[in-house]
Amino acid sequence: MHVIKRDGGQEGVMFDKITSRIQKLCYGLNSDFVDPTQITMKVIQGLYSGVTTVELDTLAAETAATSTTKHPDYAILAARIAVSNLHKETKKVFSEVMEDLYNYVNPLNSRHSPMISKETLDIVLANKDRLNSAIIYDRDFSYNFFGFKTLERSYLLKINGKVAERPQHMLMRVSVGIHKEDIAAAIETYNLLSEKWFTHASPTLFNAGTNRPQLSSCFLLAMKDDSIEGIYDTLKQCALISKSAGGIGVAVSCIRATGRYIAGTNGNSNGLVPMLRVNNNTARYVDQGGNKRPGAFAMYLEPWHFDIFDFLELKKNTGKEEQRARDLFYALWIPDLFMKRVETNGDWSLMCPNDCPGLDECWGEEFEKLYAKYEQEGRAKRVVKAQQLWYAIIESQTETGTPYMLYKDACNRKSNRQNLGTIKCSNLCTEIVEYTSADEVAVCNLASIALNMYVTSERTFDFQKLASVTKVIVKNLNKIIDINYYPVKEAENSNKRHRPIGIGVQGLADAFILMRFPFESTEAQLLNTQIFETIYYAALESSCELAAEYGPYQTYAGCPVSKGILQYDMWEKTPTDLWDWAALKEKIANDGVRNSLLLAPMPTASTAQILGNNESIEPYTSNIYHRRVLSGEFQIVNPHLLKDLTERGLWNEEMKNQIIAQNGSIQTIPAIPDDLKELYKTVWEISQKTILKMAADRGAYIDQSQSLNIHIAEPNYGKLTSMHFYGWKQGLKTGMYYLRTKPGANPIQFTLNKEKLKETQKTTSSEDEETKERNKAAMVCSLENRHECLMCGS
């Protein structure tokens, strides 16, 4: 049997040579668990004569990755093999790779099709010695296999389908793309990115330094007008943004209701549903950046709109196809008045914005007065019990996980953009809260801080380092506003006027574990608060320093910060004594701030996978989970838990199987000590009340909002109702992003008896009616006895 080498020559397969190559990459790994010989034996079994060395390396990497459940070091080894393979297949010198990317000729039409901009290339070539020597290629070996495969699949630029960039090249391209001729700042950013202190968002990593540097993640639009022109102009904006890889939030509350008169044609409106189906097809057709991700639009509606009941049905799996639009995402923009009416089971009036104008243009007391006035004037199209609508909302959430819940009055009351007008919606991921209008499309550029990195070897948290990195991030995101490619003019108008940015986090759960703080402990709750205090303080300080140099943003005059009112003041909270807020307020009074908004903890799905961290502000969902790559699916055990069990001599095949049998929970495994059971509770074992309380604690330092998922293993209407009301009363802006539930049955252990199925189908319809009655009773019970109701102990 022979292999074909990279130079085209042939060589016989040598067991020792393969083992030696793997052995060289095992430095620093736990030799009690990692066995290169075993990997070689498995690799040899999968070989055939004429295999290339590239394929051999790929097979070796995947073989190591399948052993990740034995020990997390296998994921590191798998990545090292894959990275070493990439290094052999790519050029080393950064400036040469950038030249190749610029000189690319498309073989289909023989046209010069540069993949980076001429400006980027010129800067790189003018500073090539500094930039080339600043890159530390060994840092490529710090990724785990699944992080590296994510980079390889979507982030590293390719020439004719073959990866041309190494991860370090990409990070330097991004840094130069942001900082241009400021080489010192580019190298500083490169070092922080490559050492994994933080990461820019996916669109920034995809597009920085290219011909179309569309570096923004989030776009928010309000319908331009309730007319064919307004609707299709907005739809065109959505298509152009989606084409450039942006996620979108759209406020649709101004669109007239079903059956209302249209003066221009002397006809009647078809309402929201047909319009949303057009949006649905646009999202399917125009994906984000040419097949990188599917197009994604979230539609925001206020619950007084006459079409609200139809809106809540749109994502459901059953029902008439022409009444469904399942590729969109749905969100409610909820005024406090609705929550009050649900609580007291008052009446709720459904209205058409054409007959009752201005409801989406005001909030708080002004909204309540206008709404009551329209009710008294008899302008409502339909009156229902508020709890009837609430029931429909809960039913939709239980079935589809949506609509998202955002509280309109909290979003406006606690916004630094109150001086601009009423905020009408959030974005696709519910963490951006910005003003939109007919001539302004709100935009946000994001980055996330890897919190696990700030835990020292002495198990202390380095707040100073967190502050210094935050200040760099603010400067980077502020620069992106000026160098960004804007898919529509209205987005550029908005972003350059108000200059918002969004700083989030990832690895909060990892930081707690490294500090040995159980997620619900008082220590974790204090650290949670102080982390966000620090980020908010440092972000304001950095933005104030930028304002001293360049002046405050255009619409600064009259905003709460200009009056000395910061986010925690709006929440009526007092910070801890970690930072000197009085001194900062004095600085801001003198110089202002350069950015209207600063913090927005986002979901971080892809970038957390790249850096090997748990997502965002979330607890671990399971201690055993799957990672998919193109070659297949791999099972992974929480690396922190695996390390702890290994150190205590508790890790073996039997333990692994017990954790799998318990679906990733360790709470009922007798051999595991109590301190580890506390530390490794999954989100299903943590009180959601604590999750909501911690969201409110950090919320006092978050001037936008946060992507907050709610996890209830088996939701009933009572639990869900009590949980929503608790979040609302805590003052949250985002009450819920997704409702996550556990599947009704474990697919691995589930078999079905056909006779049983027939019996079940007979009894289902009568049980459905009983279930509905029980759900209604549970919902009412939880509203009447929110503090005592046992059903609602979430």
UniProtKB/Swiss-Prot annotation:
Residue sites binding GDP per the record: 202, 217, 427, 431, 604-607
Enzyme kind, highest EC tier: oxidoreductase
Catalytic activity: a 2'-deoxyribonucleoside 5'-diphosphate + [thioredoxin]-disulfide + H2O = a ribonucleoside 5'-diphosphate + [thioredoxin]-dithiol
Keyword Signal: no
Means of activity regulation: Under complex allosteric control mediated by deoxynucleoside triphosphates and ATP binding to separate specificity and activation sites on the M1 subunit. The type of nucleotide bound at the specificity site determines substrate preference. It seems probable that ATP makes the enzyme reduce CDP and UDP, dGTP favors ADP reduction and dTTP favors GDP reduction. Stimulated by ATP and inhibited by dATP binding to the activity site.
Keywords recorded for this protein, A-Z: Allosteric enzyme, ATP-binding, Cytoplasm, Deoxyribonucleotide synthesis, Disulfide bond, Nucleotide-binding, Oxidoreductase
Molecular-function GO terms, alphabetical: ATP binding; ribonucleoside-diphosphate reductase activity, thioredoxin disulfide as acceptor
Broad class of where this protein is predominantly found: cytoplasm
Cellular localization per UniProt: Cytoplasm
Important for electron transfer, annotated site positions: 737-738
Pfam families: ATP-cone, Ribonuc_red_lgC, Ribonuc_red_lgN
InterPro entries: ATP-cone_dom (IPR005144), NrdE_NrdA_C (IPR013346), RNR_lg_C (IPR000788), RNR_lsu_N (IPR013509), RNR_R1-su_N (IPR008926), Rrm1 (IPR039718)
Active site: 427 (proton acceptor), 429 (cysteine radical intermediate), 431 (proton acceptor)
Site (Important for hydrogen atom transfer): residue numbering on this chain: 218, 444
Sequence ranges assigned to domain ATP-cone in this UniProt record: 1-92
Role, per record: Provides the precursors necessary for DNA synthesis. Catalyzes the biosynthesis of deoxyribonucleotides from the corresponding ribonucleotides.
Similarity comment: Belongs to the ribonucleoside diphosphate reductase large chain family.
Record's subunit section: Heterodimer of a large and a small subunit.
Record's protein name: Ribonucleoside-diphosphate reductase large subunit
Naturally occurring in which organism (per UniProt): Danio rerio (Zebrafish)
Gene name tied to this protein: rrm1
